[in-house]
């Protein structure tokens, strides 16, 4: 049986661009099954050590000396399409020290862009502890309740998104 049948598939790359695995989102929200599905864990693919979008974002993260972290694949894609390229995703999982180590190779500044719902706030708070423990500077930018970086950005220009991120990002400490 095709593991990813009826799903949009997102290739997940290493920092060097090698395809390590896939994430997939169900197309029909009516089905009673997991919304997201990933490649099985293996020696090559370990979700907790990978950041979605890192291969495409790494140069801009280093250039701008800041990394935006979002929750999901579509958040990364939408922001990249709008021109905000220094964005990666924790792929819906809590941030890990391995993921932060990847970012630390590029910058010491992280801005968390998580959903405006309770789960997003909780994920942000958990991630902040790991980022601070790793010795990085952390800022937080929240979105209006019910919005995530993807939905917020859909009808906005690059300039509007950039202004929002600059005006609503707050140093955590």
Feature map (PLM): residue ranges:
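Phosphate-handling DNA/RNA-contact segment within nucleic-acid enzymes
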Residues: 1-106, 110, 123-124
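Conserved acidic, small-residue-rich alpha-beta core segments centered on
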Residues: 123-134
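Flexible glycine/proline-rich, aromatic-decorated loop/lid segments
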Residues: 100-103, 129-131, 166-172
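C-terminal or mid-to-C-terminal helical accessory/interaction module adjacent to the motor/catalytic core
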Residues: 136-173
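Short, hinge-like loop/turn segments at secondary-structure boundaries
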Residues: 106-107, 128-130, 155-162
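Short, solvent-exposed loop/turn segments at the edges of secondary structure
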Residues: 3-5, 105-107, 133-135, 144-147
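Acidic, metal-coordinating catalytic cores used for nucleic-acid/nucleotide bond scission
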Residues: 74, 95, 114-124, 142-147
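Conserved protein kinase catalytic domain
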Residues: 34, 38, 128, 150-153
